[in-house]
């Protein structure tokens, strides 16, 4: 499969207009700081799990959790390193390490990483029973694509039905594959497209979701994909990516 050329990650998306370096830098800082919340939430969730008597008795599970904590710390470190690359950050760019990856492994890693985050938010995470074939390959940066999915799962956990279920599914669409996250909450509302604008929030304003969705949109478009969503009953948010079924 062909790789893609380097693309801009932080750029003018959903009305985010940055005219000068001075204007751009605070917005980049807010975007990156927002992304640091997910790994820290994961670590908090794992810490609670480690404190349980059941995990204390299960050596194998305890080692697995410690491994996930290390992975979350590595993700935090990568974000910090990229933030330190001042010249790239000031230009609104971040490096992407592209390569082919199996869709099944991307989904599996995402579910494993997001499980403690959902437990922390009292939500149930599962692979959709109506999911299409989770086969084939996409080309991209594994770290950033997983970050996109975890962002969508985190938003579903925040704004979905309390104690509800979050379902991750896929659907093949010709030479593209759609990856989507559904919940059983109240839907996205009539102005769903506006949620991809910076600093937008859902009806529940306890935590902002606009920064996360803005970054998800930018990353997806850098992979030559597009955002997808459905509001109302059975609502979901997802994205498509170029896909090879082989």
Can you annotate each of these PLM segments?
Residues 71-76:
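Short alpha-helical segment of the dimerization/phosphotransfer core of two-component systems
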Residues 117-128:
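Short conserved segments within the C-terminal catalytic ATPase subdomain
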Residues 188-199:
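Short conserved segment of the HATPase_c
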Residues 212, 216:
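Short alpha-helical Gxxx[C/S/T] motif in the catalytic ATP-binding
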């Amino acid at each position: 499969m062909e790789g893609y050329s380097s693309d801009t990650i932080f750029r003018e998306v959903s009305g985010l207009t940055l005219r000068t370096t001075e204007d751009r830098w605070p917005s980049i800082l807010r975007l990156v700081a927002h992304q640091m919340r997910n790994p820290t939430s994961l670590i908090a969730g794992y810490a609670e799990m480690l404190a349980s008597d059941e995990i204390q008795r299960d050596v194998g599970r305890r080692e697995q959790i410690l491994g996930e904590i290390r992975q979350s710390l590595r993700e935090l470190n990568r974000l910090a390193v990229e933030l330190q690359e001042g010249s790239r950050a000031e230009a609104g760019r971040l490096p992407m390490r592209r390569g082919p990856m199996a869709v099944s492994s991307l989904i599996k890693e995402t579910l494993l990483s997001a499980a403690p985050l959902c437990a922390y938010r009292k939500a149930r995470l599962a692979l959709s029973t109506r999911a299409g074939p989770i086969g084939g390959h996409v080309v991209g940066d594994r770290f950033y694509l997983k970050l996109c999915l975890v962002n969508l799962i985190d938003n579903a956990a925040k704004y979905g039905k309390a104690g509800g279920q979050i379902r991750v599914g896929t659907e093949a669409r010709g030479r593209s594959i759609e990856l989507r996250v559904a919940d059983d909450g109240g839907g996205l509302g009539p102005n769903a497209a506006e949620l991809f604008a910076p600093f937008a929030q859902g009806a529940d304003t306890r935590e902002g979701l606009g920064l996360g969705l803005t970054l998800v949109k930018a990353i997806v478009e850098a992979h030559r994909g597009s955002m997808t969503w459905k509001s109302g009953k059975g609502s979901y948010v997802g994205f498509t990516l170029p896909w090879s079924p082989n």
